[in-house]
């Protein structure tokens, strides 16, 4: 049996957006906690959003190369997931997973077959892998920024590796 399709809507910033996402039937919502993102949400607002969402939809807080104090602050809010969307090493992802006590999603930038080969290093460390397009040259923040990558590159991925596409 194939893994179920999971719909995650990221960039939620308000209670209205949260309610619309829940009503639309999404499985998970993401809140960006990265000041350079136009979708950045403060810790205080994330706390309110998580509290409102609890028991209705899974929540995920997106962090970029967080320090330990940021991880602890976010973990204390009780999200279902923390998504790491920066250049975190496998060792750092493992440490954050142990520290946070919540499920960890690791986003990996894909732009070449070599990028796909790095997925295996995170497969047993992160609870879920999210494959995203490599940021365009000159981008000042991570993520595909609305771009896609050549999905034919996924043919080089071990079929036993579960993943999500961004």
Provide a role label for each language-model segment.
Residues 1-166:
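Conserved N-terminal beta1-alpha1 strand-loop-helix module at the mouth
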């Amino acid at each position: 049996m194939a893994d179920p399709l999971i719909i995650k809507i990221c960039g939620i910033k308000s209670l209205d957006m949260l309610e619309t996402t829940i009503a639309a039937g999404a499985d998970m919502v993401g809140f960006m906690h990265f000041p350079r993102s136009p979708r950045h949400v403060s810790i205080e607002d994330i706390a309110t959003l998580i509290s409102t969402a609890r028991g209705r939809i899974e929540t995920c807080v997106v962090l970029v190369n967080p320090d330990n104090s940021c991880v602890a602050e976010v973990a204390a809010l009780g999200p279902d997931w923390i998504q790491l969307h920066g250049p975190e090493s496998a060792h750092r992802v493992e440490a954050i997973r142990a520290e946070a006590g919540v499920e960890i999603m690791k986003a990996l930038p894909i732009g070449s077959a070599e990028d796909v080969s790095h997925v295996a290093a995170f497969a047993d460390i992160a609870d879920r892998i999210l494959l995203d397009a490599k940021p365009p040259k000159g981008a000042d923040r991570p993520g595909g920024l609305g771009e896609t990558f050549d999905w034919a590159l996924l043919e080089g991925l071990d079929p036993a590796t579960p993943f999500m596409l961004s």
